[in-house]
């Protein structure tokens, strides 16, 4: 009986500790995001291939999809969680900015364009042509419903950028903690022969042991790099599909209200 009470007490203590660690995890995530966004805004090249001939050759000549560590080795340790920060890049020959943006803003049909990673999606609201909220059901790393707030910005006739913040994540069935946050930052640059696409994704999952992380990509799909590659590959394949028809933005939806902003960081220790 004493052993049972001790076990119960330990279990409750662990559960309470996990609950208490969540606000700290969020604060550390907010600090990381603040530093990451400052880094993105201050870099000289709009897309990395502009100042990197080797990367440009890989994307254009070799037609490859490249992933790059955005801020050192992954995962980054958070209190009670782990964060992955990846940059992915692809060149889509023959694509145009208008067609690509139109496809990506078709939030009701994302499963048609990203069949490897998304099973369903629905646009919830929109404000004009630059602010959207939508929900999608992801297939990996598990069946996860994600609601996101998205803002598009057209910089000039040849460049777009877009940011997407998850506002709610919910794993269907048992909650393994595979995905707590999904922030993504997209850049699109049109040139004479096509469009450069670059994305930086910042994801957070619960803290897993070393063995789980080592086996994650093989057994459980805890692999944001792989998911990013799948998304870029599907994007290229879908926008180049012959006869692609993209519906107009739907009318009759509510406006989205104020755009979501991540919490700030009061400390100077963010990475």
Located regions from the model:
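Bacterial N-terminal signal peptides
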Residues: 5-15
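Cofactor-pocket helix-loop regions in the catalytic cores of large enzyme subunits
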Residues: 18
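Eukaryotic helix-grip
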Residues: 21-271
């Amino acid at each position: 009986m004493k052993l049972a009470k001790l076990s119960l007490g330990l279990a409750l203590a662990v559960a309470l500790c996990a609950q208490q660690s969540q606000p700290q995890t969020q604060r550390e995530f907010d600090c990381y995001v603040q530093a990451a966004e400052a880094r993105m805004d201050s870099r000289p090249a709009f897309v990395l291939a502009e100042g990197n001939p080797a990367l440009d050759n890989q994307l254009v000549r070799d037609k490859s999809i490249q992933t790059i560590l955005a801020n050192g080795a992954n995962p980054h340790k958070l209190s009670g969680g782990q964060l992955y920060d990846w940059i992915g890049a692809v060149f889509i020959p023959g694509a145009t900015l208008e067609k690509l943006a139109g496809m990506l803003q078709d939030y009701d049909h994302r499963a048609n364009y990203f069949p490897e990673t998304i099973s369903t999606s629905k646009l919830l609201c929109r404000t004009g042509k630059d602010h959207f909220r939508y929900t999608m059901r992801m297939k990996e790393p598990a069946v996860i419903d994600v609601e996101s707030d998205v803002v598009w910005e057209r910089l000039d006739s040849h460049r777009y950028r877009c940011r997407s913040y998850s506002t709610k994540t919910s794993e269907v069935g048992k909650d393994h903690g595979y995905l707590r946050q999904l922030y993504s930052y997209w850049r699109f640059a049109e040139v004479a022969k096509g469009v450069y696409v670059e994305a930086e994704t910042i994801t957070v999952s619960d803290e897993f042991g070393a063995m789980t992380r080592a086996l994650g990509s093989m057994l459980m799909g805890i692999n944001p790099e792989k998911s990013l590659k799948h998304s870029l590959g599907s994007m290229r394949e879908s926008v180049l599909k012959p006869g692609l028809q993209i519906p107009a933005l739907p009318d009759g939806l509510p406006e989205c209200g104020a755009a979501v902003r991540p919490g700030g960081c009061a400390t100077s220790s963010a990475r």
